[in-house]
Each structure stands twice: as C-alpha cells, then as structure tokens.
Amino acid sequence: MTPPTIATILAASQAEPCRPWPRHRLPHTAWRALIDALRHEPHRLLALWADTIEVHALLLHDPGLGVVAVSTAVEVGAYPALSAVRPAAEPFERMIRDLWGHHAADAGDERPWLDHGQWPVTLPLSPRPGSAPIEPEPPSFPTAEGDHATRLPIGPVAGLITDAAHLRLTLSGTAIRSAEAHLGYTHKGTLALMRGKSPRAAARFIARLSGDATVAHSLAFARASEAALETEAPPRAQALRLLLAEWERMSVHLGHFADLGVLTGAAGLHRIAEGAREHLARAAEAAFGHRLLMDVVVPGGVSHDIAPDGQVVLRAALTAFVETLPPLAAALEHPPLASRLSGLAHVPLALANRLGAGGVVGRGSGRAFDARALDEAHGGIEWEAEIQRQGDETARNLVRLREIAASIGIIDRLSGFLPDGPVAVTLPAGSGEGIGCAEGPHGDIWHWLRLDHGHIAAAFPRDPAWALWPLAEHVLAGAAVEDVALIRCSLGLTVSGMDL
C-alpha cells in the first residue's frame, strides 16, 4: 500500500476557516501519518505552538511557497512529537511543555526551555497553572565526554548591552567540539498579556517583542488580524507599511556592519555604518515620530500618517545615504577584514533547509526564500530576492549590501507616489482566525491569532530566531572559541522575539 502524502492527508481532513490558509484538524493517526510523510517530503517547519486543547504546526513547501497549517488534539496531556523528523521542532516542544504542560510523546529532549524555575506559577497558559517550585533546579546540560574535554559557559550576563543568552561550549583546547544554547532569560509573558485584548491594544506588546524587528512583527500581526476579520488596510497604509519595513531592513543591516566593525577592530567600517544608521534614525523620527518606527504599524493600517514634510525628509536622507554605500562596500572589502570574514560561520544549504533558516542566513547559503514573495502588496514593485551560495559571512554581507540597495529603490518609488486616502480602518469586533507574515531583517516572521468577538482568544508569534539558534549550535561546532561573539553577530542571533 502506498503511504499517504501530505496532500492526501490534508484532503481527508477537516479544514477550519483560517485565512488566508485554512487550518487542517488531524486526528492522532493522521498526525502520525503526517510525521511519516515529512520523512520524504520537503516541507519546512515554520512554527509549532499550542492552546489549551490542541497543538498547531505551520509548514512551508519551499518550491511552490505553499503554506500548510495543521492541528491535532492533546490527548491525556500528550501529542506525537514532530522533532524526530523536523529537528527545528525541539525548542518549540520544550516551550509548549513549559507554557501549557502538553507533553511531546517520544521527544528526545524534555528539559525546560523558557521556565527557569523563577516564575510565580508553572504552566501559566494552562487552564490550571501550578505552584512554583520551592527550590528550582538549575539548567541541565549533557556531560562533556572525551579526553581533555572542558566546558566553558558564556552568559547570560555578559557585562555588555547584548542579548541575554547562555551558551555552554564543550572544548578541545581552543576548538569548540559542541555548543548548546539555553534561552528564556528575557521572557515577557507576551502570550498571556495579549489574551482578552483587542488586536489594536495587543499591538503594543507585539511592537516590543523584538526591538530590531518592531515593524516586521507589527506588520505580520496586523496582517493576521486583518485576515481573521476579512479586512484590508487602505492602499495608502499598505504603501507606508512597505516603506517602513524597508527602512527598518536598511537600519538593521547597517547595525550589523557597525557591530562587525567593533568586533573585528575595523574602525572605519564602524564609523561609516554607525553614522549612516544614525542618519536614518533621525529621518525616521522626523517623518514618523519614532527612531525605531515603533507603534506605527497597527491592525487596520498605520497609527498616523507620514509628517507633512516626511517624504522630502526621507528622500533627502536616501540621497545622502547613497553616497555612503561605496565607502561602506570598500571597508568590507579591505583585505585584512575580508580575509577575517571569508569562510566565517559557514552554513551549508542542507543545514539551512533542514532547520528552515531564512533571511540573510538562508539566502546567503542558497535557500531562495523571501517572505516578500508571498506579499501581494509587493506585486506592483520590481523586486527580486538576492541569493548567494557560499554560505559564509562574506556571502551574507553581500546579501545585506544588495538588500540595502534594493530597499533604497523600493523606498524611492514608494515615497514619490504614495496613494491618497485614509491611513487606517476600524476593525470590526468579529471572530475568526488569521495568519500573517512579513520578511524581517533577520528572516521570515509569522503570526497566528484567533479572535472571539473582537478579542484575542489565542495567538502565537514566530520569530526567525527559532531557526537561527539551533543552526548556530551546528555552526559553532568546530569553530574557535575566540570567534563566538563574531559568529553570533554574523548569524544575526537575537533572543527577545524567541523568548516571548
């Protein structure tokens, strides 16, 4: 008998009205058949999350950009684990157990992910949260094995303004044999804070989920809210949203180059990139009222229109910025720095595909996926994803430089021809489910939510870090210990969006 394919499994399932992609409810037998089918079919796992009675997964079929949402019931507190066939599911499964208490049957790793034993309750999103432990257990890590193996803990406190992440390295001399990340130190309780609120009220929490992707997260959340209620933002708002997203992309890429300059001692690179980023931040504040563009994108459109002279300010800033691109590229090509970055943090295409890594990391390794291809609003703009195949920091920086150039072109066209009309609509107090996505500076961002009479019953945001941190563990293995900070910078590792 021919085993069922994902297509036949979905065709035989109950489809729930979720927009723009239906959510398929699968009994455990069909969910296990899906797991078997994933052994042979190339669907990437985007996200895995839960509510009080079900577990949900979001899959992407790269070649056709097909998005698949599936769910299965939690029976006797458990559901069949996906991590055996999709390793990227492992941190999601650990997160689900921490927040809802659902157990991933046959999962290889059941250690806590977010819960460090410091919360006032356990299982905070379950119907019956438990009492906090009197003496919380410290995080556990595999024992170092082999002759002369030593352990080196790094973080979460580093004495710098940086993301709070704990890395446990196993070393042989100065070479890293294996690496394991432990996150959750910046958990904010975002999912609990959002429940019961309107999308417009919850948007403030989403805007603060990850500071360097505030526009992208807000945009994906707004699109999910609008899809759930079958509402569209006005044309002027859609154009402004695209402009804001590209402005954020340029700023974050410049921030990467500035950080790279600090870590490598390339003072010229740092000076050029930091100066350009500051110039863009001032223009953003003048045009939209916030240097990081926070709270501008909201469900229904944008919170306010561009300033009366905003288009002139942005175009003037772009004109000045264009002049910095040649010296920026020259600084990256300076022989000592170029030699240092060549081959750094190599990501094979197979690894990027296996873990579903997108953004600059995925495209720098040859994975041709950019969530903007799913965005109908980009349909009228000439745009093409930048792909490199070397998979190292040099390739990723080339992607960043060319994305900056592409963003300049997109913003220039948008700022010159903004449609007239309102910048927002009021969302109806209806019920429904929606999924939204946006291409953030570090990769694809996805939001799902369920609304009940205008209020959020359940929601989940998927940050690119869910794919990038497991990938970093593979990349760090074999690297030199002195390169850890540089590799973290190279891969664009952040934690706040993943820590929820």
Regions found by a protein language model. Give the residues of each.
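Short secondary-structure capping/junction motifs at helix and strand boundaries
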Residues: 101-110, 231-238, 290-294
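Terminal low-complexity/charged segments
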Residues: 1-173, 337-342, 350, 407, ...
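Flexible, glycine/threonine-enriched loop-and-boundary segments that flank and lead into catalytic domains
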Residues: 426-447
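Generic, well-ordered alpha-helical scaffold segments in large soluble proteins
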Residues: 37, 98-99, 224-228, 246, ...
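Short, glycine/acidic-rich hinge or "gate" loops at secondary-structure transitions
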Residues: 106-114, 264-269, 294-298
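Active-site- and interface-proximal helix/loop "cap" or "latch" segments in soluble metabolic
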Residues: 150-258, 263, 272, 285, ...
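Intrinsically disordered, low-complexity regulatory segments
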Residues: 269-273, 277, 283-433
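Short coil/turn segments at secondary-structure boundaries
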Residues: 49-51, 258-261, 293-298, 332, ...
